[in-house]
Amino acid sequence: MSEPAHDVAEQQIDPWEAAYLRFETQEEEIRKFTDRLRRLGAGEWPRESNVVELFCGRGNGLHALARLGFRNIEGVDLSPRLLAEFSGEALCYVGDCRELPFADQTKDAAIVQGGLHHLPVLPDDLERVFAELRRVLRPQGRVLFVEPWLTPFLRALHGVAQHPPLRRWSMKLDALATMIEHERQTYENWLDRPQEIAQLARRYFRAEHESFAWGKWNFVGRPRL
């Protein structure tokens, strides 16, 4: 079941969420998301599009979409604590992205920025999310995914994050290392399955853009009918 985030009581923050909140400021993350969405083509989408962001967290991706001029925006995330951080106009739901609270073919675009790698059971959960996305998207809709990928850059970053002196020197690096520690099982399970993940995405969506750089997988596509 899903419910509007503002109806959910505050919950005690967990260690992963605490690290996420100190990894970068709200403004830093909004600027990052705005630049990323523009770079991946979202700046060219019609502004009246119905756009939903899955795993939207504290809603900075929703703020980025609003800055780009989108007016019909919704978000879904499992964490009421993170959603309580959002102060924008988009309607946000506490809900499971494997079972979306939307009718068939009602969305023009769906965005995931760093949420798929949190899924506990791969590939089953990933296929459930992809099937739900294909269900709620209109035939000419789009998906946009940005997820961690084990490029040489990310391997090097993992190595640096293992050194306590460097973590003490950089709050951002320490926050990243803490997030990895608290999601290690799902994170490493995701990174260990690159071919399987990419093939599953291409089975559900026809790629218009796909790239692997700076520790990220960037995918933009349309649903296969």
Region spans (language model):
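C-terminal alpha-helical "lid/dimerization" subdomain adjacent to the S-adenosyl-L-methionine
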Residues: 146-202, 210-211
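Short catalytic micro-motifs in class I SAM-dependent methyltransferases
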Residues: 114-118
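A short glycine-rich, Lys/Arg-flanked "PGG" loop and its adjoining helix->strand segment in the class I
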Residues: 127-139
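Conserved class I S-adenosyl-L-methionine
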Residues: 1-46, 48-57
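A conserved beta-strand element that flanks and buttresses the S-adenosyl-L-methionine
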Residues: 111
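Class I SAM-dependent methyltransferase SAM/SAH-binding core
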Residues: 58-99
